[in-house]
Amino acid sequence: MVLNKTTGVIGMLLEFRCSNHKSIKNEITFSMLAGSDDTHEKSLKLHNGMRILRTAVIYGPNGSGKSNFIDALNFCALMVDKSMRFQPGEKVPQSEHKTSEEGEASSYAVQFLKDGIRYAYGFTIQAQEIAEEYLYYFPKGRQVKIFERSGQTITPGDRYKSSFQQSLSVLKENRLFLACGGKLFQRKRSGGSLSVFYQRSGDLRFKEE
């Protein structure tokens, strides 16, 4: 589930991927999408052809990376929520694996359902700056680009080309574009999917039991 700090469940997590975060070196994937085994088919949630697990457990011995996996997920949410506050020249707090080479990238990507629509968002940090970022959503099951980012260059989807000018004015190398655009659209009560996803992704919070 995707949890809101005050109002409870707001959506369903589908997948989270990360790499080069603390003890996590190579990319790992946590997925709530069911495999081909249909033994417990009645326990699954079905949506637009996806077979989704209702519950999952992360387990393993001490030192296997469970805590750092949760830390990576919470870091992803923290960046969406807080990076707008970073000042020009301030470095992004990248937490590389101890064996990573200088300048090696760290990546984070999340997918979840909200109001029946699937969203996919991710970003890459390199040399303590935002190197790449993207946001898609899937109305009627088909992928639609909201924006893609490479360095300081933003490529909006067709229906968003006239919407992002004010967001670009506050974009910095250490700020996520989602944070810039989401904050502005949230204040205006506009922005459609960008505003909705910003509000939801900023509330991603997980904890160990």
Set out the residue ranges of the language-model regions.
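Pre-Walker A-like glycine/lysine-rich segment at the N-terminus of P-loop NTPase domains
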Residues: 2-75
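Structural beta-strand/beta-sheet cores of well-ordered domains, especially the beta-sheet scaffolds
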Residues: 14, 106-108, 174
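Short acidic, glycine-rich loop/turn motifs
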Residues: 18, 22, 112-114, 137
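Short beta-strand segments
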Residues: 26-30, 117-121, 145
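Conserved P-loop NTP-binding catalytic core
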Residues: 45-51, 57, 61, 70-121, ...
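Electropositive, glycine-dotted interaction segments
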Residues: 120-209
